């Protein structure tokens, strides 16, 4: 799918902003601090379901508002698709596809985006855990099955590690090890 246009409302320094994308390569340019990176961040949110810059909603919502919205309009040879994102301070994210509410995991992969920025240098030069995190994101975009298994794996690993911290016995940890071995 390709992005056709996008509307930002109270997203960082954009209070009410429309952008149309052309076919092929698009260049976003302007002075420092006008919101070029915010446009990329909004596209990323519509693709991945979260910001690449922060986990704190109050950093994304414009200080003149208590909410934000991003609407992206996408197309391919067969479909037109509208992905919407809303966030209110202190509330859960709301995603919609063509007006129907969706959980964020159903957004991932609809419109694949891979981010490579100077901050992502750790992907190539950083710790193995950083590379793993990058490729987990990439493969999750390409395969919903991978994403589902990754979520289950991380949940099992978290439970197992909690038991290890509590010095639980071998017989308590073994079932979690067995489950981990399936992934």
Positions of predicted regions on the chain:
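Pre-Walker A-like glycine/lysine-rich segment at the N-terminus of P-loop NTPase domains
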Residues: 1-45
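Generic alpha-helix structural propensity
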Residues: 23, 34, 38, 55, ...
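An accessory alpha-helical subdomain
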Residues: 122-183
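ABC transporter nucleotide-binding domains
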Residues: 24, 42, 110-112, 134
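Phosphate-binding site recognition
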Residues: 13-16, 20-21, 34, 44, ...
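Short, histidine-centered active-site or binding-site loop motifs used for metal coordination
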Residues: 23, 117, 138-139
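Nucleotide-state sensing region of NTPase/ATPase domains
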Residues: 47-130, 142, 146
